Amino acid sequence: MRGSTFLLLSIVGIYGAILNAAAWSVNNFLMTGPKAYLTYSSSVAAGAQSGMEECKFQFGWERWNCPESALQLSTHNRLRSATRETSFVHAISSAGVMYTLTRNCSLGDFESCGCDDSRNGRVGGRGWVWGGCSDNVEFGERISKLFVDALETGHDTRALINLHNNEVGRLAVKATMKRACKCHGVSGSCSIQTCWLQLADFREIGNYLKMKYDQAHKLEMDKRRMRAGNSADSRGATAETFHHVHSTELVFLEDSPDYCTRNASLGHHGTEGRECLQTGKNLSQWERRSCRRLSTECGLKVEERRTEVVSSCNCKFHWCCTVRCEQCRQLVAKHFCARRDAAVANHTKRRNKGHRR
């Protein structure tokens, strides 16, 4: 039993150690465990990894940028937290695992799973019927739940929050699914369509959950009942709090720090030394403001550094059949957050106190 538990804890890639390239090798944790776990473990690992990569993309220009040290979410971790950021990590990891299991099921990677054809032949709407090969999200949801939710063995508030946010991630996969259709009819008239459901691009799920992160709900617990030491009273307070929370809403318990300052014990690296964006093509308004958010509002200055970038250029096709390119060097201006005079920095941070992350 302990071996199976260790496999579950190891395989779900929401721990910092798992993000290490060497530790990420599936072979590292296929030493034990039931056959069912061995069947799906590589998909679970790949799904958790894709969730972490999406987290880093979504928070790339935020003060908290999804660092590896912040992803050690074991409920047995003494430093575990229940912040807004933790809620997103649980949701995106859970979504990544479900997404990959569902996709690999449709690709025929598992003997025990195939398309969801349960609705095939039924009328779906005016001019179309269910058919084709719908992605089997019920399968992905069921297996991902076995792996991801097994991390939470406790019954305390933090464990319940983590389980809730795991479910938000799984519901996000369902909420973003797309209907795809194929036309049928004489001479391409499309008099009737056959339609099926397919997974959205994972980036869309990331965007959806980022929106949920921005709208996340802070739980206000009855602290007197929580401190009373009565487990039944504590469970009652928790149940009452969750009664008003929607199933698709991310929740958190603790306010986040400003993430400006380095705190090694908590795994916060601060923003000093981080790159930020000021100029460039196709930058969003949020990206253009990254220097203000990461530097100015954190009491740092923006420092421009010129970096040499080497790229292939002047490529030509030679018969037959190679492409030869030259190596071009170009100086590119990049901007970084740097320390400024202490007095100026303290004045700036006081002035910007209260700004949103």
Curated annotation (Swiss-Prot):
Primary residence: secreted
Lipid group attachment sites (O-palmitoleoyl serine): S187
Expressed in which tissues: Cells that form rhombomere 4. Hensen node and the neural plate immediately anterior to it.
Gene3D superfamilies per the UniProt record, alphabetical: 3.30.2460.20
Keyword GTP-binding: no
GO cellular component term of the entry, any: extracellular space
Record-annotated disulphide pairs: C55-C66, C105-C113, C115-C133, C181-C195, C183-C190, C260-C298, C276-C291, C313-C328, C315-C325, C320-C321
One example GO MF annotation: cytokine activity
Post-translational events: Palmitoleoylation is required for efficient binding to frizzled receptors. Depalmitoleoylation leads to Wnt signaling pathway inhibition. Proteolytic processing by tiki1 and tiki2 promotes oxidation and formation of large disulfide-bond oligomers, leading to inactivation of wnt8c.
Cellular compartment(s): Secreted, Extracellular space, Extracellular matrix
Keyword Signal: yes
Glycosylation sites per record: N104, N263, N282, N346
An example Gene Ontology biological process: regulation of fibroblast growth factor production
InterPro entries: Protein_Wnt-8A/8C, Wnt, Wnt8, Wnt_C, Wnt_CS
Keyword vocabulary terms for this entry: Developmental protein, Disulfide bond, Extracellular matrix, Glycoprotein, Lipoprotein, Secreted, Signal, Wnt signaling pathway
Annotated SMART domains: WNT1
Segment forming the signal sequence: 1-16
Reported function: Ligand for members of the frizzled family of seven transmembrane receptors. Probable developmental protein. Is likely to signal over only few cell diameters. May be involved in the regulation of axis formation and in the rhombomere specification.
Assigned protein family: Belongs to the Wnt family.
Protein name: Protein Wnt-8c
Source organism (scientific name): Gallus gallus
Gene name of the record: WNT8C
